[in-house]
């Protein structure tokens, strides 16, 4: 790994992580945010099979939201060695409700085309109505997703593709494209979970039947590379994805999801298997289930630097105004015996009730709005795994009282 790249991604990661812990300078809110991106589906069809129904598109959106928020049902399949590296991106997706002309829309646009396939030397033909495709809605305002036939000579040649943000340092300039081509393109047979056109079909389709091609391609759209860094056999371990919590991997994974694969075995370092669970691998969908924390930091960094014009909805998780900090004297938290975190109070003027939120270091909410009273001013940590947590104490007026990191240990 080049030193410059190492310094760069460290800076990106630290910026994203530290911004979850401290207020941004000159703003009133903490920066722990949830982004929601507006999506428009462009359906290009030459026959009825290609004109997939709304339910599949809405299901695809559901898959995006579940996988990006780590709400997918198969998180339990993340192997123990990687569980601490998996996290919630805090990025949501919703169908656009207003079109570029200001009119109401369902976020789904359909167009008949004379083209039997959009697989060609110029894959971007699908993005132009003059070539039988559909013009993008302003790519600085919408996440455009085109759904079309990407077959070649009757074979399912390509399942999807996307481009990274223009100028993104993880990619060479050959990978950058101008704004009209920004967005995601999907083969119609792999849209949604259990699409009948892919489930039980040829291996490449059956192993891609959980709607995660879209998850993978949106990862590219937000700047992520394949976890093997697009290296090849013989030199792949020296090629990097610029993400430090994805283990080095020589080549893409096979569909067999081999949990014992370790294609970059370094005898002098800690051993990690290939991360077949990662959405940015080519492993079968049934073993994919995670993004890593540094992948998350990189995607959120792309939204804050390279895709700033997207009109994302922003939800401030903490909803804590810095200027309204309401301090109580001699108040602190500490971990005590009996698996508790106790609020130590020496001020008789404390309110009769307070509320506690607890976050783990990935930003996930562990305990939500737990009520404390003067007779029971403590929180149980019995169900919390060992680690560092952020305890956020508020009064009944929702004013922040105290915010403190505490290390929870287990005997």
Residue ranges and their predicted role:
Residues 358-366, 389:
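Short, glycine-anchored, charge-dense loop/turn motifs used at functional sites
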Residues 121-226:
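Active-site-proximal segment of zinc-dependent metalloprotease catalytic domains
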Residues 312-342, 346-349, 409-410:
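Residue-level detector of functionally pivotal "anchor" positions at catalytic/ligand-binding pockets or at interdomain
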Residues 343-345, 368-370, 386-411:
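C-terminal tail/sorting-segment detector
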Residues 288-326:
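A recurrent domain-boundary module in secreted/ectodomain proteins
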Residues 1-139, 148-149:
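Propeptide-to-catalytic entry region of secreted or membrane-anchored zinc metalloproteases
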Residues 192, 199-289:
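The catalytic-center signature of Zn2+-dependent metalloproteases
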Residues 375-379:
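Short strand-edge motifs at loop-to-beta-strand transitions and within beta-strands
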